[in-house]
Amino acid sequence: MLKSSNINSVLNELPNDPARDSTAQSSHNGKPKQDAETCCSSQDNEVMASLAALQLSAGVLQIAEPPLNHVRTQLRELIGRQNKTYIDLSKEKYKLDCSEVARLNDMMSDVKRYKDKLTKIKKEMQGVYQRTKELKKRAANVAACKQRDYQRKLERLQHEESLIGSQ
């Protein structure tokens, strides 16, 4: 609300207009005083309206500015914390990415090493298979030779017995 003392003090501080001076002079004449008063009163109303608007906006600013400043500082702090958190998360992501890359490289080297071991074992298994195949063949030949030797020995024994028996 506007206080009349404030309006009067502001109006008293306004520079004297020639229109106001003429109203003061015309007030001595009679009728022109009434026209001058209506003219001045409309100007006074405009000045009062603009003054009221200024005082209203100043009052609103006075009321709203401290909370807005407080909110502004809190917002700055929040943005600062968000930036710090974002930077920390970015660093952690980079560390994880680096560790993932390192782990992937380790895994790939393990895969290569195990593949080499597997091919080596496969070659050894093929070599063992070939040797067992040859050994089986030799064993079959040896068994066949022993069988023939045994048959010859039996035949010789039978032949000797037949020679001894015929005497």
Swiss-Prot record:
Instruction: Fetch the InterPro entries from UniProt.
Output: BLOC-1_pallidin, Snapin/Pallidin/Snn1
What keyword terms does UniProt attach to this protein?
A: Coiled coil, Cytoplasm, Cytoskeleton, Synapse
Q: What is its main location?
A: other
Determine if Magnesium is one of this entry's keywords.
Answer: no
Top-level lineage group: Eukaryota
State a GO cellular component annotated for this protein.
Z disc
Coiled-coil residues: 102-160
The Polar residues compositionally biased stretches are 1-11
What effect does gene inactivation have here? Viable and fertile. In the neuromuscular junctions, results in abnormal tubular endosomal compartments and a reduction in early endosomes which leads to a decrease recycling and recovery of the synaptic vesicle pool and results in failure to sustain neurotransmitter release during high-frequency stimulation. Does not affect synaptic morphology or basal function.
Localization, per the record, is: Synapse; Cytoplasm, Cytoskeleton; Cytoplasm, Myofibril, Sarcomere, Z line
Annotated stretches, region: Disordered: 1-38
**Any single GO BP term:** intracellular transport
Q: Which Pfam families does this UniProt record tie to the protein? A: Snapin_Pallidin (PF14712)
Q: What does this protein do?
A: Component of the biogenesis of lysosome-related organelles complex-1 (BLOC-1) involved in pigment granule biogenesis and membrane trafficking in synapses. In response to high synaptic activity at neuromuscular junctions, plays a key role in promoting efficient synaptic vesicle recycling and re-formation through early endosomes.
Subunit and interaction comment: Component of the biogenesis of lysosome-related organelles complex-1 (BLOC-1) composed of Blos1, Blos2, Blos3, Blos4, Dysb, Muted, Pldn and Snapin. Interacts with Blos1, Blos4 and Dysb.
What family does the Swiss-Prot or TrEMBL record give for this protein?
Belongs to the BLOC1S6 family.
Q: What is this protein called?
A: Biogenesis of lysosome-related organelles complex 1 subunit 6
- Please tell me the species this chain comes from: Drosophila melanogaster (Fruit fly)
